[in-house]
């Protein structure tokens, strides 16, 4: 795979270059000491790079979170159904991530009545106008549904990696509609790795190091969780929103959660701040 290198005299020159059409944002892998940018050629849809893991549904996954500048960058934090994201530095000042400042909660009383995607309107899946991936990236980008997350677990090799590059492969246990992924005894060390998170790669690879060398993998960084004006568990746990309400509870929505002890698709309070990852391609949602 071709790699490119561009040098800058200072950080201001780098920021100015980012504003030009020569800057390919989705392909930037990292910025070193404020004067170097390395990036890799990847397939692109509507200006954002994706990885094709050969999934049965044909779903293509974005290589980075919405708001991120690289695959290891945490990106922005979003409440479910909100399209405005916030940096970690803005949490606690511009955004609390609580019912009191959630876009779909009335605050006139203590119950914080849900105003959309509730038992009255019976909407269970985000409309594209409320989909953070679609609103911010356009094209055919949208947030993944629960079925697309479960497909990732069942159709790839995957596992948790520490910021020291220690990878532990996970194994899926459950049905087509539910289950969890837990650590196995299979481990590996990835050289020059410095960000904790979760890795997915094709079953055809013998080891995670082969997939990393081929740059043929999906990585989701452990960006933590926002709530009550704080960002917690950064570098330990990660969470990424799905596009549908949690079963039987309009106050919660599905999300992919992971850590060093396990991973799966669970429910979380809608007001919480999590990462958003875009996908291209459709898959029928699980109905129950």
Regions found by a protein language model. Name each.
Residues 14-20:
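A short, charged, amphipathic alpha-helix used as a generic interaction element across diverse proteins
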Residues 3-8:
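A short, exposed loop/beta-hairpin motif centered on an aromatic-Gly-Thr core
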Residues 25-288:
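Conserved positions within compact, well-structured domain cores
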